[in-house]
Amino acid sequence: MKSVITISASLAISLMLCCTAQANDHKILGVIAMPRNETNDLALKLPVCRIVKRIQLSADHGDLQLSGASIYFKATRSASQTLNIPSEIKEGQTTDWININSDNDNKRCVSKITFSGHTVNSSDMATLKIIGDD
C-alpha cells in the first residue's frame, strides 16, 4: 500500500512539472553587449535555426538606445523582416512582445537577429537580452 501511495505521489509531481514546462515556451535566445558608440552591425546568430513567433527585449545591465532591428529567416531567398522596436530601453525594463513571422508563414525559422544601437548614460557596456516565444 505504501508503494502505491509513493508511486501515485511521484506521478502527480511529474505531471505538475511537465505541465509547468509546457506552459512557458519562452527561451533566452541570447545576449548582446551594446558598445558605447552607435553601431549598426550587432548580430545574434542562432546556432540552431528556431521557429520564433515573437520576441521580447530586455536591458539587463545599463540603459540602451536602439535605432533599428531586423530578423533573418533561413530560406533560399534569405528573407528578412524589419522589426518595430522602442528607441530606448532602461536598465531592468523589458519590452512588450514584438511579433514576427507576420505573413503567417510559421514554417520559417530564425537564423539571425541584427540590431543598431549603443549604450547610453553609462561608462560600462549595456547588455541586451533577447527572449523568444515559439
UniProtKB/Swiss-Prot annotation:
<comment type="similarity">
    <text>Belongs to the UPF0412 family.</text>
</comment>
<protein>
    <recommendedName>
        <fullName>UPF0412 protein YaaI</fullName>
    </recommendedName>
</protein>
<keyword id="KW-0732">Signal</keyword>
<dbReference type="InterPro" id="IPR020240">
    <property type="entry name" value="UPF0412_YaaI"/>
</dbReference>
<feature type="signal peptide">
    <location>
        <begin position="1"/>
        <end position="23"/>
    </location>
</feature>
<dbReference type="Pfam" id="PF10807">
    <property type="entry name" value="DUF2541"/>
</dbReference>
